[in-house]
Amino acid sequence: MFYIIWLVVVLSYEVVVVGGGHAGCEAAAAAARVGAKTLLITHKIGSIGEMSCNPAIGGVAKGVVVREVDALDGLMGQAIDKASIHSTILNQSKGPAVWGPRAQADRDAYRTAMQDIVLGYKNLEVLEASVIDFSTDNEAGSPCVASVTLSCGKVLHTRRLVLATGTFLGGMIHVGRDKGIPAGRMGDKPSTRLAKALCAHGFMLGRLKTGTPPRIDRSSIDWSATAEQKGDLVPTPFSFLSDAIVLPQVSCYITHTNTKTHEIVRNNLHLAASCASLVDVAAPRYCPSIEEKVRRFPEHKSHQVFLEPEGLDSNSVYPNGVSTSCPIDVQLEMLRSIRGLENVRMLRHGYTVEYNFVDPRELHHTLETKKIKGLYFAGQINGTTGYEEAAGQGIVAGANAALSLSQNHAPFVLKRSEAYIGVMIDDLVTLGTSEPYRLFTSRAEYRLRLRSDNADMRLTEMGYNAGLVSERRFGVLYNKKQEMDRLVEELHRTSITPHTLSKCGIFISQNGEKKTAFELLGHPSITMDILIQLWPSLNSFSRAALAAVGIEGKYAPYLQRQAADIQSFLEEENASIPADIRYSEVHGLSKEAQEKLQRAQPFSIGAARRIPGITPAAIANIIIHLRCRGRASHQNS
C-alpha cells in the first residue's frame, strides 16, 4: 500500500531527500537510521526503486559497493536478494580481490521490494511532489539550507537537504534527429526549475548523457540461435543478512552483432542523436552505444549482445550491448540483422538522455557542498553512472546530513583504504570528472583489502559507532568475528612438517620447519578444503567462517606488506590542511598550482597530492608552510 502525505500546514523536517532512485532511497533510509526526522520527496511514489536502464545489480567493483552499502545497513542488497533471477560471481577464475557479485533482477520484484522497505521505514515519510527551489539563511555568516519549495507552492522547512535527482535534472531525451523531449526517463517529466534554482544559487552546471537499448519481445527471439549463459549453481546473496535467494533462477543468452549490423549503423550515424551535434556532451566511456562502438572500433567484426530477461512473468528482454539513439526504424533494422533476432519485435525503442550535473569538486568528502551548508548531492548529479555508485553516495550523503545536525557527532567519511565508496568519493571531490564516472577495481590502490567477502568486517562496526547500523546487524557481525577468531586460533595452534605433508601428496619447501595450518593457506596450491582433509575437526566450523578465513589466510602475507603502505597513506590523510589557508601565501607555489588548490580546497596533504598537476615540489612547499604556521601559532600562544 502506498502512503501519500497531504500537506495542509507548514511542516518541518530535519532532513529532506529529493529523488526516489537508488541514491535517494539510500540517503533517506540512512538519515532515518541515524535518527533524523526525514522526508523523501519523489515525483511518483510508484517509481521508487525503478531500474531505469539495465535490470541488474553488481558486477566487478560495483558488486563490492553493494556489499559495502549492505554492511552499513543499506537497502540495495536486501532488495536485490528478493528479486534476483540470475546470480553469478564474475572473475571466479581470478583471486577473491576482483570477484564481482552480480545479479539479474526481476524489475517488478526489485521495485516492489524497495518500495516495501522504504514505505515502512521508521523515521521516514514519503511525499509525492516536485521540488522546484530551496532557500537559505545565514548561519555564522555562511548560507545554510532553510526550506524547499514545491511546485504546488507549499514550503517545507528543513535544516538539511539531499539532492539525488538522477537524470531528471534538466533531463532531455533524444531519438534520431527529432527534437528532444524534456524528460528524465521515458514518460517522466524532468526537474527543469530545480536546475535553474541551482544556477541561481551559484552552482555551475555541466551536461552529461547516457543511453538505453530497445526492449524486445521474448516470444519473437530464436533462442536456438543463441548461446545459453547459466548462473551459478548455488546463487550467492548480496546481503550479509540473507540466507538464500528466494526466486527461481533463469538463464541469460548471448548473441553477436555482425558486419551487416555495423553497416546499418555506419550508414545511419548521421541520423543518430548520440553522434550528431544534437547531444554534444560526454557519454559513459565504458558503456558505449552501438554507434560509438562502430565508430571507435572499426576493426571489430562483432560485439557481444547479452539477452537478459526483465522478469519471470515479463515478456520483455533487455539486449545489453546495443544502446542506441538511432531513429526507430533504424533500430529495428539493426536488431533484425543480429543472429537469433531476425524476426524480433521491439516493445520499446532505445534513446539517449542528457542531463545536468554539478562539478563534484564543489563538495566535501561528506558530500556536503562547499557553497551552502546543509546541502548535499548524491548520485548522477555528481557525475557518476550506475545504480551501485549512486547507492554508495546516497548512504554517505544521508548519514552525514543527519549526523551534522548535532555537534556531538563526527562526520562519516570513508577513506580510500577502507572502502570502494571511499575511493569513488575521493576521486570525485579531488579530481572531478568530465565524463560519467564508473568504478573499477583498478581505481583502488588497496583492492586486496577491499573485497566483497569482507565488506562487513571492514565497515559494519564503523557504521554501528556512527549510529548507522542496527543492533541486529552488529550482533550478526559480532558472532561471525567470534567464530572466525576461534578458527584462526585453531589454525595457528595446528602445525605440520613438510615431510608429513609430502606423504599426503602435498609438496612445499622441504626445509624441515613446521608450518602452521594458517601459514599453509598462504601457499598457492593449498586451500581450506585441503586443510579440512588434513584436519577433519575443522568441519565443526561453519562454511561461512571457513570460507572467510580461507581468503584472509590466502592474502595474509600480502596484506601484511600492504599495511605499511596504508599507514603511510593514513599519515598523509591525517596531515590536515586548514580550511582558511591562503595558497597565495605559500612560498614557491606557481599561479596554476594556487588556482587548482584554491578550487579543490583539499582537506589533507594526501588529497592535495592527488590533484592533477600538483607536483611533489608543491606538496613540499605546502608542508613547509604549515610547519612554519604551526610554529608561529605555538609561539603566539
Swiss-Prot record:
Function: NAD-binding protein involved in the addition of a carboxymethylaminomethyl (cmnm) group at the wobble position (U34) of certain tRNAs, forming tRNA-cmnm(5)s(2)U34.
Subunit structure: Homodimer. Heterotetramer of two MnmE and two MnmG subunits.
InterPro entries in the record: FAD/NAD-bd_sf, GIDA_C_N, MnmG, MnmG-rel, MnmG-rel_CS, MnmG_C, MnmG_C_subdom, MnmG_C_subdom_sf
GO biological process: tRNA methylation; tRNA wobble uridine modification
Coiled-coil portions: none
Alphabetized SUPFAM superfamilies for the sequence: FAD/NAD(P)-binding domain
Binding site for FAD: G19, G20, G21, H22, A23, G24, V131, S191, Q380
Chain residues that bind NAD(+): 283-297
Keyword set includes Glycosyltransferase: no
UniProt key word NAD: yes
Subcellular location: Cytoplasm
Domain of life from the UniProt record: Bacteria
Family: Belongs to the MnmG family.
Keywords attached to this entry: Cytoplasm, FAD, Flavoprotein, NAD, tRNA processing
Classification via Pfam families: GIDA, GIDA_C_1st, SAM_GIDA_C
Protein name: tRNA uridine 5-carboxymethylaminomethyl modification enzyme MnmG
Cofactor: FAD
Molecular functions (GO terms): flavin adenine dinucleotide binding
Name of the coding gene: mnmG
GO cellular component, one term: cytosol
Organism from which the protein derives: Anaplasma marginale (strain Florida)
Record Gene3D superfamilies: FAD/NAD(P)-binding domain (3.50.50.60), GidA associated domain, C-terminal subdomain (1.10.150.570), tRNA uridine 5-carboxymethylaminomethyl modification enzyme MnmG/GidA (1.10.10.1800)
